[in-house]
Amino acid sequence: MRKYVIMGVQGSGKGTQATMLGEDFDLEHISVGDIFRWNVQHHTKLGAQVRRIMAAGELVGDDLVEGVVKAKLAEHDWNFGFIIDGFPRNERQAEFFLESYDIDGVIHLDMPDSEVRRRVLARRLCSGCGMDYNLLASSPRVAGKCDVCGGELIPREDDTEEALAVRLRDYHQKTNPVLDIFRRKEYVVTVDARPGRETVQQAIRVKLGLPPRELPLPAAAAGGQADGQPGAAGQPGSGGQPGG
């Protein structure tokens, strides 16, 4: 049973890489961000709190985040491993996590801020069904419309230049020290997150000592993309169940 943390600045592909690992190794993908977005979309009390924070481009407070993680892991089926993204984000959260849970490794997706801006500002969310898109990877068949339900594609509420600048600042100030804590315990493997998703996935597996992933058929044969640009059109987003 494998237990991993995946870390990286927003837009580095944490969700995509975590999902790929989860599918092949029976790991539950626990995404703190997806849990929050699900609550925002469904107008829960937690969602109202998070909406105000996200709109300001700030990070959610420790007590709120730790409560969500505790609740999610309390219901986790421990016959399966997990890969958690979006947590821990600062030293206090890291200390709480290490005191509470054993892990096998920390995957650090490394990416320069300039590439983060390029990726994040290309993200879109279906206003109808919640499917995630990234216009750098693959445009929808009809511009501005969801391939699944035909809903309007809109930027995420917190994907603005101003909000992103705040998140990048907070990331470097608060998250880098977390990596130092994990490095001292020799948990961290660092992978360049700039190449295509399949290249990044294979690099992660090499560094973790996991079997390689079977590569998909080339685009011409499979009728789709092979190792394209980061992010994906038609990836499940906040319209699904949180953290699944």
Segment roles from a protein language model:
Residues E28-D102, S114-E115, L121, L125, ...:
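ATP-dependent small-molecule kinase phosphotransfer cores
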Residues I6:
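Hydrophobic anchor at the beta1->P-loop junction of P-loop NTPases
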Residues R118-A165:
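Cys/His-rich short segments
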Residues E152-G244:
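NTP-dependent small-molecule kinase module
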Residues V9:
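P-loop (Walker A) phosphate-binding loop of NTP-binding proteins
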Residues K14:
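Conserved lysine of the Walker
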Residues M1-R2, S100-G105, R183-V188:
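Short glycine-/polar-rich loops that comprise or flank the Walker A/P-loop
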